[in-house]
Regions:
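ATPase catalytic-site recognition across NTP-hydrolyzing enzymes
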Residues: 166-215
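Walker B catalytic acidic pair
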Residues: 102-104
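ASCE P-loop NTPase helicase motor core
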Residues: 106-182
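Loop/turn-to-beta-strand initiation segments
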Residues: 76-77, 96-98, 123-130
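Inter-Walker segment of RecA-like/P-loop motor cores
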Residues: 39-97, 197
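Short, conserved catalytic or adaptor-binding loops enriched in Gly and charged residues
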Residues: 59, 68-75, 146-155, 213-214
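Conserved P-loop
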Residues: 1-66
Length: 215
């Protein structure tokens, strides 16, 4: 899934390089990768370093998780930032050409409320990819967004895949996945490996019914 999302980022970057931008737009190309917390950015950063062609990179700052990108005559440079969603108040005041949200199921509604306006800035391309396993609750933003895209919202697309759709898995890998049914509650296994939505897929199930008084 990360490679697919990276492909969308790369396409947005390449498309932007031929679209003139007003000189007041700083940075000329701006992209974020949003993760639930900063420690979870390590894998994303390592993948970026392996996937972005070196010719595209001007310089990097690993501590801040920022990559300055080489540009073109119409967009002199670009900025790619890995952003943590643990502090929603830090996720504002930017307009984005591309937003990639990873592990969407673990990002709070409050953080999404700050992320969404970054895609409503005039002059920006405002493309986005949201990926993850199903959220636990029907009122979570990722669940609502998937439902809207699945129902045909304009300019949105919904894709669903299971672990069995991964062509790189060996028969041994598949056997291990099947064996995890012995270790996990089936509702959790189906959420993790089949991407099935189930409000009882958490380790504390029936919570909603208990809250409603139906014990």
């Amino acid at each position: 899934k990360s490679r697919s999302a990276f492909g969308e980022f790369l396409k947005a970057y390449q498309d932007a390089m031929v679209i003139p931008v007003d000189n007041s737009m700083v940075p000329p190309f701006h992209a974020w990768i949003a993760v639930p917390s900063f420690p979870q950015s390590n894998q994303v950063w390592n993948e970026l370093m392996s996937l972005i062609p070196p010719a595209f990179i001007y310089r990097t700052n690993q501590d801040d998780r920022t990559i300055y990108l080489r540009g073109s005559q119409v967009r002199p440079w670009g900025l790619l930032e890995v952003k943590s969603c643990h502090n929603p108040e830090a996720l504002q005041t930017a307009g984005l050409d591309f937003l990639w949200v990873t592990e969407s199921q673990d990002i709070a509604n409050k953080a999404f409320e700050k992320l969404l306006p970054t895609l409503r800035s005039p002059g920006r391309m405002s493309r986005a990819v949201f990926e993850g396993i199903p959220s636990l609750y029907s009122d979570h933003w990722f669940r609502r967004g998937c439902a809207a895209a699945s129902d045909g919202r304009e300019n949105h697309a919904y894709f669903h895949a299971t672990v069995y759709d991964n062509p790189t898995l060996s028969p041994e890998d598949v056997a291990e996945v099947e064996g995890d049914k012995d270790l996990l509650p089936i509702r959790v296994w189906e959420r993790m490996y089949l991407a099935n939505f189930n409000e009882d897929a958490g380790y504390f199930n029936n919570v909603s019914r208990c809250i409603a008084g139906d014990l």
